[in-house]
Amino acid sequence: MSVKDFVQQRRDTLIAMRRDFHMYPEPAWLEYRSAAKVADTLISLGYDVALGADVLDLDSRMGLPSDEVMKAAMDRAIEEGANPELVEKMGYGKTAIVATMKFGGEGPIVAFRVDMDSNDVIEAKEDNHVPAKGGFRSCHDKAMHACGHDAHMTMGLGLAEYLAVHKDEFKGTIKLIFQPAEEGVRGAKAMAEAGVVDDVDLMFGMHIGFNENLSNCFACSDHGFLATTKLDAVFHGYSAHAGGSPEKAQNAMLAGCTAVLNLQAIARHSQGASRMNVGVFESGTGRNVTPDVAVLKLETRGATTEINDYMIERAKTIIKGAAEMHDCTFEITKQGETPAGRISDDLAREVQAIVEPLGIFKEVPFDYSGGGSEDCAYFLNRVIDRGGRATYMVVGSAIKAPHHNPLFDIDEEDMLNGIVALGTIAAHYLK
């Protein structure tokens, strides 16, 4: 059976699966229900499934929620039908899965990476929003699959089922990596450092959506990844009465203001794109109280890892200087980070030659440069560094609103076409 026929046969099941994932979104490191459902499915298909601490370098995890938050998410996942044994194995920030199937005969080790986490977004309730109208809007407060990771999990499991059903036709090994905490670029490093791709010959990452210009297209590479670092900076001062004794205060808010203005003024780099954004600034408790704490949440980006490093060092210098100017102390904590990703152009050209003849996409461009950041770069770079090849593909979709927007939604036909493409690519290299 061709991949196209298989997907058509499983169409209703795959759409229902995507809608189930969509209805139960879980943010970074809290993907207990999602990961348990994924693992249960992979086990039932006959995959050798490793998960939790077995596929994570625990010290390399970034931006973990508190134990209290994680425990509440674990309990909720079990209440919502997750396998309790699997939740326990992946508990407290260990929601990572690697599924492997070895086929008969010698062949390459081919890996696909899938991300699972949701966004901190309140999903729209309007009738023109298909998930709301169709009854599969998020049932979790302040969590939404607003970046297509619900579709990614479905595509990964659709690929897994196709390969398992047709396993006698293949040679080599398939490795399916289901990664937590892509949002905020917090999860891939821990899996890469655990060595999960060290034996991989061909590495594929992918994403659905992006913009209307890419609708019903399949891009075979993405050369636009920016390196990025996510930082929290906290200034500590000393509060005093704003009218009675202002001279005794150490104003943390002023330190924060000084930092924000000068962070945004960092000279941009001549060798490529550089970015700085302070997305959150929190300070103050009352109009007549000098603020003693200020919190900044910021990010840097760079076209190369070196440019991003330049932005980080300038940011740290400015934060330190702002603290000293206002007689405050400070602390900086890293919440997420990824290098710039590398692509094997020859592999991307091969993918183009494999997908184009399918005739299901209006265009199959060689490259799409989105200008965002993706911690799949850890996997891509590690495979290339060890002599393998890697690329990152984009399944274009007629999205209803921008990524991370309350009205975001993908076209499920594009998701199904994406499974056809992934299955065809995998089959090509495993035959």
Question: How should each PLM-predicted stretch be described?
Answer:
Residues 21, 42, 112, 149, ...:
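Divalent metal-coordination and catalytic microenvironments
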Residues 2-145, 158, 169-170:
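Acidic/His- and Gly-rich active-site-bordering loop/insert found
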Residues 86-91, 182, 221-225, 367-370:
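Short Gly/Pro-enriched turn/cap motifs at secondary-structure boundaries
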Residues 10-13, 17, 30, 34-38, ...:
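General structural feature for long, well-ordered alpha-helical segments within catalytic domains
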Residues 44, 253-431:
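Metal-dependent amide/peptide-bond hydrolase catalytic core
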Residues 63, 97, 119-121, 127-144, ...:
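Histidine/acidic-residue-rich, glycine-tolerant segments that coordinate divalent metal ions
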